[in-house]
Amino acid sequence: MQRIAMFLAILGAGASAVLTGGCKSPPTQSEMAAYDYGPRPENYEKLIRDYLFNKLLDPGSAIVEFKAGPRQLFQQETTLRPLRYGWGVCVWINDKNTRGVYDGPYPMVFFIRDGKIVATNGGPDDNIIGWRYARTGCNELGAPFWTP
């Protein structure tokens, strides 16, 4: 009985940390301005397509839609994600699964600085937290993503 109580206490503490760990107030303009975003990337579409080539199951038939950006994007550090900033680009991707069928689009956010992708949210190798950050990032960039 004591083991069950201890397990439930640990489970409750972990769930509480996950649910509240990602919550922070939005960054202020001065916080965002304190970082060097570098020059606005001109070749962002090529950078992103090259990045995705090794990540997607079928990159040749994947549908990649550039929805918003590049715009300066700042993501505060939380217990779940490190600080991320750069030129943000929201992309919606529809890739084929292992059966050769399109699964439906999902959002990704790319952070680009000094001509390189320095971080991403969402995507095939990210977790559910990253997918949530991708939706939030796309929303901030002006391309809200929702699942019908």
Segments from the language model and where they lie:
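Cystatin/cathelin-like cysteine-protease inhibitor module
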Residues: 24-148
